[in-house]
């Protein structure tokens, strides 16, 4: 089993976010796109460690640290500064160490999960008297995926997310899924993908909550859904087709790109078959990011 939050919240494995379905249903006057998405999570992402200290410090390590260093807009630092600014009366200097194990700009919410980890840790460490839902809503300023990642850390459930990420519905009866993640190594800009959309008003996401209760019924229901961002992402990263084909060939029951890419996922019958597929794909493509995970679920 994956390690969840410790009781003293001094460290956390941050959420991996998976958009099993993602429909773009409109665009606001301010340019933000409106989405409807079925989102599953696994608490097996980056490792975030906290300690109190004399002055704010941040250390970045891990296999994908180099890629993140070149991104000046680090979400761990932004989330820390957000908490300092929002709760100055309870704030204290922090030391954070992030072990970056997830690819950067890969469509699985790595940075947003890191930000959510910072907020969750500091909410407890500073003993803040702020309702969770209010804090989650406030965190939207850090990015559309941050509130949903906070919900994953707090409630350990899949979600239905709407709007620009602020409308969150908990799915309290959903099975856990055995998933294999595959990323061929190309970063894809979220902004560029949305900008390249041919149209911004697609049909709404409709999925029967009963379908979430078993792997087979969920896979069947997903056949009637989409990721509307796949088409523009494919133009930027043609290798996505190969990644999806390999997942299918290795026994995936359903394969799709998550978010704006480039990470793709495959749903497998059980954890054992997922782990076997991950080993096979890694042996064929040793330079790819490949990871077998189990998602959060209540069944």
From Swiss-Prot:
Pathway listed: Isoprenoid biosynthesis; isopentenyl diphosphate biosynthesis via DXP pathway; isopentenyl diphosphate from 1-deoxy-D-xylulose 5-phosphate: step 3/6
GO molecular function: 4-(cytidine 5'-diphospho)-2-C-methyl-D-erythritol kinase activity; ATP binding
Enzyme Commission number(s) from the entry: 2.7.1.148
One GO BP: isopentenyl diphosphate biosynthetic process, methylerythritol 4-phosphate pathway
Residues where ATP binds: 103-113
Domain of life: Bacteria
Gene3D superfamilies in alphabetical order: 3.30.230.10, GHMP kinase, C-terminal domain (3.30.70.890)
Cell inner membrane found in the keyword field: no
NCBIfam families: ispE, PRK14608.1
Function statement: Catalyzes the phosphorylation of the position 2 hydroxy group of 4-diphosphocytidyl-2C-methyl-D-erythritol.
Family membership: Belongs to the GHMP kinase family. IspE subfamily.
UniProt name for this protein: 4-diphosphocytidyl-2-C-methyl-D-erythritol kinase
Organism: Bartonella tribocorum (strain CIP 105476 / IBS 506)
Native organism taxonomy: Bacteria, Pseudomonadati, Pseudomonadota, Alphaproteobacteria, Hyphomicrobiales
Gene name linked to the record: ispE
